[in-house]
């Protein structure tokens, strides 16, 4: 088909050591990916590094009626330089934390103070990794733009009764 990919926007399940090796600061093609919350990734370590900044006005912005905390940090991931954009969707964090407290009040009371702090942001906390040097607000907008594109393709696919992109040939294009 002659399609060349020069930019990727991916969910956490697709971010891997191999991908970071191919797309890091200094590489030509760009990537935005959601960092998985699993072993080998500094997901929670980044929270501990920025936790005292969460709630500070300097790092706050609004996107689609949600208040966000966002900060960019240059890190090494799998020995490659990359930007980690650390976010808290404060609306989701507060709403889901409140729901958690209603259902788990006794469990919460038993937690250590530092763990209680984590639970106040846990349900809105996420990290994006990218080789793009921009503001946290702009990168988040680019990341969520992916969902808008997915909706367009899904709607067009259903409306036109198209095959998935992976099954397209020169003649179907």
Task: Please place each PLM-identified region on the residue numbering.
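Anion-binding and metal-coordination hotspots
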Residues: 1-173
């Amino acid at each position: 088909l002659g399609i060349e990919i020069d930019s990727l926007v991916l969910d956490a399940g697709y971010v891997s050591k191999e991908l970071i090796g191919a797309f890091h600061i200094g590489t030509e093609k760009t990537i935005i990916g959601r960092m998985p919350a699993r072993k080998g990734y500094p997901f929670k370590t980044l929270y501990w590094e920025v936790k005292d900044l969460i709630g500070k006005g300097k790092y706050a912005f609004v996107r689609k009626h949600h208040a966000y905390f966002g900060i960019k940090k240059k890190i090494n991931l799998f020995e490659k330089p990359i930007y980690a954009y650390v976010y808290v969707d404060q609306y989701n964090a507060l709403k889901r934390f409140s729901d958690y407290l209603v259902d788990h009040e006794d469990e919460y009371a038993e937690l250590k103070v530092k763990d209680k702090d984590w639970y106040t942001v846990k349900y809105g906390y996420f990290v994006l990794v990218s080789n793009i040097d921009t503001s946290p607000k702009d990168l988040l907008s680019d990341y969520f733009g992916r969902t808008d594109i997915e909706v367009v393709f899904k709607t067009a696919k259903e409306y036109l009764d198209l095959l998935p992109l992976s099954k397209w040939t020169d003649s179907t294009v």
